[in-house]
Amino acid sequence: MEIRQHEWLSASPHEGFEQMRLKSRPKEPSPSLTRVGANFYSSVKQQDYSASVWLRRKDKLEHSQQKCIVIFALVCCFAILVALIFSAVDIMGEDEDGLSEKNCQNKCRIALVENIPEGLNYSENAPFHLSLFQGWMNLLNMAKKSVDIVSSHWDLNHTHPSACQGQRLFEKLLQLTSQNIEIKLVSDVTADSKVLEALKLKGAEVTYMNMTAYNKGRLQSSFWIVDKQHVYIGSAGLDWQSLGQMKELGVIFYNCSCLVLDLQRIFALYSSLKFKSRVPQTWSKRLYGVYDNEKKLQLQLNETKSQAFVSNSPKLFCPKNRSFDIDAIYSVIDDAKQYVYIAVMDYLPISSTSTKRTYWPDLDAKIREALVLRSVRVRLLLSFWKETDPLTFNFISSLKAICTEIANCSLKVKFFDLERENACATKEQKNHTFPRLNRNKYMVTDGAAYIGNFDWVGNDFTQNAGTGLVINQADVRNNRSIIKQLKDVFERDWYSPYAKTLQPTKQPNCSSLFKLKPLSNKTATDDTGGKDPRNV
């Protein structure tokens, strides 16, 4: 005991404390318990690693999915953007046939075409032009690829003795269908035409426009496009009376694909409405106008520097860059400095519904403005027939009244009356002659001309479908100028015995008519025509 105590006391202080520390340490676990703990720890650690790997993979998968969604959304947005760009951009006005403002033909020939009813006699030195029938036949004879026609009437195959020209035209159209020439025709859905059905059976493509559903109106457009090169625009539809009984007027453009480039889009607009009962809220960019009143087509007409554009009605049918007919007429009247000559069948500034009639001032007010504010001379040549509205005389009297006691205010009005001249016809002529009517629809000034499909009646412009043509020329004195030719036609009719002043009950002097010479065979061969007055 003493020895152990001595040993402890003799030991160094550091050694004693170390031994005490070692003795105070807990006993180490047995090897078996150590192995179990190690295995448990390893298992937990492995599970934790697996969970972390799974979470990392899940994060990567979610991130990858998000990237795919973002990429897909970007691709869709890019595709939509490209589609919108290509639908919005119309490079240089190019159409589906590759025709564009860069490669179209703007050096054109233009000719007036007229339809002079049988028995309508002018003086020997009066101007005459190519007959409507011959002009149409010329176009069909020139056709090699396509014929596109818009017309409100399709009654060519009639049994009346004066319907022979209509029958010949119908036979020519049938012939073209067998020559691999593409025929496209547009008509109003109300047209019950055996001619259209016959042409359709032969392969012609026929589009019926439901103007009643679109705008409570009807189709009155009348124009042709042949081989994407030649154009007719005028008052006449494809009706045997337009080639026999009615006085019609229009123009034919030859080799004028620049004008076709624009007019073809109106035809395409009509065709796009096939089988549709409503007008789309937005028109395709391919139907936008190429030229309008702000951007006129620059061209040569019979080697005369000219400008031109086509207009459309109703306003519902005027996509972007397409001039409304009323605006086109405004531009012609506003540019007039000396005179405005207007030849239409009816003049009635009234908009009518089934329950009421309201004043429609659009054109009436423009005429008054030209008379009073700019001292432009105005002449109105209207038709007098059984459907002339009595209110027409009231409005004409009102127009004349505003020039009372106003210096340099000149308005003159005449009625072109072919019906009363039947009193001068022989018994044989009366037995087989249908009512004749002047259906011209044009205006000419000292620098421009407008040729359209409408009379100057409110409902025509607001509800019906029609196309107009405006031509501007600086040099209107040479005989090749279409504006001078149109002015000469107006003055020929104005000074003829068929044009009467505001006295609708006065009977004609038959003896004065017998002094006039009939048309020569050269000019009268194909000039007999007009429109069915029941459908005007």
UniProtKB/Swiss-Prot annotation:
Localization (cell): Membrane
Principal subcellular localization: membrane
Glycosylation sites: N121, N302
Keywords of the record: Glycoprotein, Membrane, Repeat, Transmembrane, Transmembrane helix
SMART domains given in the database record: PLDc (SM00155)
Single GO term (MF): catalytic activity
Cellular component per GO, a single term: membrane
Membrane topology: Single-pass membrane protein
Source domain of life: Eukaryota
Membrane spanning stretches: 69-89
Disulfide bonds: none
Gene3D superfamilies: Endonuclease Chain A (3.30.870.10)
InterPro entries per record: Diverse_PLD-related, PLDc_3, PLipase_D/transphosphatidylase
Domain PLD phosphodiesterase: 215-242, 434-460
Pfam families named among the record's database cross-references: PLDc_3
Family from the record: Belongs to the phospholipase D family.
Name the UniProt record assigns to this protein: Inactive phospholipase D5
Organism (species): Homo sapiens (Human)
